[in-house]
A protein has these predicted regions:
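Glycoside hydrolase catalytic-domain context in secreted enzymes
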Residues: 1-354
Length: 354
C-alpha cells in the first residue's frame, strides 16, 4: 500500500512536469515469485525464498496491497518471471528448462496461480528461458495454463529483450519479424525491448493478423482504464508530501524488524552500551549502501549501513572499528594490492574488540 501510494504521488508529480519516461508509470514489475533454491542465483534476494506456498502467500499480500480494492487500481502489480526461472543467469537467454510435469505443477507454478486466482494480479512477465522447448514469451503450454486453466484476464509482458532471444539465443526463429509474430500469436501483449518495431512488417508479411495485434492492444488499454488514466480518481491529489513521510518510514521499519529471524545469539544481543568499550564490524557489507538497496532501487533520502546504524545507536561512548576484510567475489579489494591484503586489518579489528 505504501509503495503504491508513493508511486501514485511520484506519478502525479511527473505528469505535472509532462514527464512520462521510463520508470515513471503505474505498472510496477513486482513481485518476483520465482523459487530460490540455489544461492548462486544472483537475483535470489528479490524472491521470497524456496517455498512455493509461502512465496504465493507473501506475493498475494503484496499484490493486494499494491493494487488496492477501490474503484480503480492504485498501481498494477506484475508477477514475474513466468515460468521455471531460477537461474542460471549466464545461460538464461538460451536455456531450455525441462521440469517434469509434477515439478512444474508443485514447484514452479503454484505461486503464480495464487497471485492470479487469489490476488487478481494485473500483469504477468514472461521469463527469458524456454520451457519444454517453447520460449516463455511465446509458449502455447504456458498460455493455456495461464489463461485457460487459471482464467488470467490481464496483460502479458516480456522480460527485457526476451523476444529478441527467440532468434539470437534460442534459435526458434530466424528474424525479428518472426520473433515478434511468434510472441504476439502466443499471448505476449507487450515487449520490453525493440522487437515489436517489426510488428507492422510481420503483419504485412502475413505472420501475424491485425486481430491478434488488436487483442494485445486492447489488453494494454484495459490496464490503463483499470488504473483510471482516462478518468478522475481518488488518487489524483496525492502529492510529494506522501513520499518518505514519517508514517511510511515507521511502517517500513516495522516491516523490516518483523522480518528478522535470529538463529543464534549466545547472549550478544541486545547490545548493552554500558558494558561495551569497542565493537568490531568486519566484512565487505559493513559499510555498503549497495548491500542495502540491491538492484532496481529508487532514491532514498538516507541510507543507514550496519556501521552507521551501530554508530548512531552506541554514540560516542563506544568505539566502532571497521574492516572490509575482503571483496564479495574477488581476491582483493583494490587492484594494485596483493591477494587477501585486508586480512591483517580484520585480525587487528577482531583482536581489539570486545
Amino acid at each position: 500500500e505504501v509503495i503504491a501510494t508513493e508511486g501514485r504521488a511520484k506519478y502525479n508529480e511527473n505528469v505535472k512536469h509532462n514527464d512520462r519516461d521510463i520508470y515513471k508509470g503505474l505498472t510496477f514489475w513486482s513481485p518476483n515469485v520465482n523459487i530460490f533454491r540455489d544461492p548462486r542465483w544472483g537475483r535470489g534476494h528479490e524472491t521470497y525464498g524456496e517455498d512455493p506456498y509461502l512465496t504465493g502467500k507473501l506475493g498475494t499480500a503484496f499484490v493486494k496491497g499494491l493494487q488496492g480494492d477501490g474503484a480503480y487500481m492504485k498501481a498494477a502489480a506484475c508477477a514475474k518471471h513466468f515460468a521455471v526461472h531460477s537461474g542460471p543467469e549466464a545461460l538464461r537467454h538460451e536455456f531450455d528448462a525441462r521440469p517434469t510435469e509434477k515439478d512444474l505443477r508443485e514447484t514452479y507454478l503454484p505461486a503464480f496461480e495464487m497471485l492470479v486466482k487469489d490476488a487478481g494480479v494485473e500483469t504477468i512477465m514472461g521469463a527469458y528461458n524456454r520451457v519444454a522447448g517453447e520460449p516463455s514469451c511465446g509458449s502455447d503450454k504456458l498460455q493455456s495454463i495461464l489463461r485457460g486453466e487459471w482464467g488470467f484476464q490481464g496483460h502479458f509482458v516480456s522480460d527485457c529483450w526476451a523476444i529478441r532471444d527467440f532468434h539470437t539465443g534460442h534459435m526458434v526463429t530466424s528474424t525479428a519479424e518472426e520473433s515478434a509474430a511468434l510472441a504476439i500469436n502466443h499471448g505476449c501483449d507487450l515487449n520490453c525491448g525493440s522487437t515489436y518495431l517489426y510488428v507492422q512488417k510481420a503483419c504485412e508479411d502475413g505472420l501475424v493478423s491485425e486481430e491478434k495485434i488488436t487483442e494485445a492492444a486492447a489488453r494494454l488499454f484495459t490496464t490503463r482504464y483499470l488504473l483510471g488514466l482516462f478518468d478522475e480518481t481518488e488518487f489524483d491529489q496525492l502529492s510529494y508530501l506522501e513520499v518518505e513521510s514519517g508514517e511510511h518510514l515507521a511502517r517500513a521499519e516495522k516491516a523490516a524488524a518483523e522480518s528478522f529471524v535470529l538463529l543464534k545469539n549466545n547472549g550478544i544481543l541486545p547490545l548493552k552500551k554500558e558494558k561495551l568499550h569497542t565493537i568490531g564490524i568486519i566484512g565487505p557489507n559493513a559499510d555498503s549502501r549497495k548491500a542495502l538497496i540491491g538492484n532496481y532501487h529508487g532514491t532514498a533520502s538516507r541510507y543507514v549501513t550496519v556501521q552507521e546504524g551501530l554508530q548512531d545507536y552506541l554514540g560516542d561512548s563506544v568505539r566502532v572499528l571497521t574492516s572490509v576484510g575482503c571483496d564479495i567475489c574477488k581476491d582483493r579489494v583494490e587492484g594494485l594490492a596483493s591477494a587477501d591484503y585486508r586480512l591483517s586489518e580484520a585480525r587487528s579489528v577482531a583482536e581489539h574488540s570486545d
